Amino acid sequence: MATKVTIQDIANELQLSRNTVSKAINNTGVLADATREKILRKAAEMGYKQFAYLPLFQEDAAKTAEPFLLPSDKREIAMLTTQFLSSSHFSSMMLDRFQAEIDHLHSGMTIHRISPIELKEKKLPSSLDIQCTAGIICIEVFDYDYAQMLCDLDVPLLFVDTPVMDMRPPLKADRLYMENRIEIQNAVAHMVQRGKKRISFAGDKNHCQSFFERYMAYKDAVEYFGLTEGLSTCAMPSGQQNYPATLYETIRRFKTMPDAFVCANDFVAMDLVKALNELGYSVPDDIWVCGFDDSQEASYFVPRLTSIHIHEQIMGYTAANLLMTRIEEPSLNYRTVYTETNLILRESTGD
């Protein structure tokens, strides 16, 4: 039976104190980098339990530590979208961070808008040269069949939000979302604690996976509190054409108005507030409204909008990490990552 290697054995080999070796192995205290590396290298060589199966200090370790660079003939990171992404869209700041993270790869990020015809015919944008493309990041690409076509390209691919995935085969790509459930449920709980009983949802739950998750979080919350009356007055018109007018017509037909609305995003919430005002209701005096995204407009809209904050910087950092590691290791299992969100209480919920 092999003799168990101890910290004292390593200390004896290196003629160092046991305390110094312990600091290096447990990553505690202050040590010179050279000393720490020498100890860890010796621990790996001797087969110490934490390092026996880890090739941390192989001769080619220096090679693996070298910065990863894209091949010279594939330096383009392509961003695909079906929409014009204004500075108000959460992805604006996210993409700034994403681009900053990939700059060291000597790559260029190009933006390609998918036209309605290209979307329908499942064709790539004419501006995109797939032969020069190292990876693709998709934002606002919510057509499932088109997304499947992109997955079949055999190009490293990341979706920031996706089409609704309920009861569908998963996309063969990495997926990045903001956390959609926890803070929606906290928003509902806040409304219930403040005496609101009829709580409804506004927004097209089938627009994208995030909207669907927000709706399901809302539904689970009202069912948990036993307040299901609000389910009958949800305002969920589908489609994007003339949405404010469609939303107005939807709520105008309600015989009973909710006490509060949870909305799919801030822009739905702002359209809803305007529609309620036109119908003679005051927010928050008569009806409370909560959005999602914490867009720039949310803080200066009248009334200032309670919303759920998306951390664009961490989304940008995570997006870069997911896509770059996919380019480096194409055989990795597909990953689904959620980043933290936070409820921000403002005037539209009486705060």
Where are these regions (language model features)?
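N-terminal helix-turn-helix DNA-binding module of bacterial transcription factors
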Residues: 1-65
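Amphipathic helical "hinge" segments at domain boundaries
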Residues: 2, 48-124
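Short, solvent-exposed amphipathic alpha-helices that sit
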Residues: 89-105, 183-186, 209-229, 271, ...
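Short beta-strand elements in bilobed, periplasmic/extracellular small-molecule ligand-binding domains
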Residues: 102-115, 201, 219-242
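Flexible loop/hinge segments that line or gate small-molecule binding clefts
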Residues: 139-183, 267, 293-305
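Hydrophobic alpha-helical segments within soluble ligand-binding/sensing domains
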Residues: 174-202, 241-249, 269, 310-328
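An alpha-beta-alpha
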Residues: 185-227, 335-350
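Flexible loop/turn connectors
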Residues: 248-351
